[in-house]
């Protein structure tokens, strides 16, 4: 047992291992093998990581998307546990909005999408503008709040799916 503890301690000290696990996970994610990606992201996040490193931020966010894409939206709720470290970006707020939306936690989803809208910068295009507005519109439409839905669809700046929703609402 002590040999295993010693090996685990060595792995914990080697800062290259989480990055290699991240690269493997990202490769599986890009190949749309989301379940395999999740396994490697999970292993990579086991390590004590610096949440300010760019690859760590990307690992957390991409893991969330991999969980959603592999039908594990309920498991993705664990990202609430790292909200304090990562919740200061439009990308993470948008991701949490999607996670809440997929778990039918619509009020929480709207709160997160609105937080994303207030953020000045984003890494993924649209998460702090038209995509957040679109998802808020979808939620309001599904809840029967058509006036609010229309307002948010109109804020999407010509985003085609929002335009189609507006057309359907007029029928």
Annotate the PLM regions.
Residues 3, 37, 75-76, 109, ...:
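Single-residue signature of alpha-solenoid repeat helices
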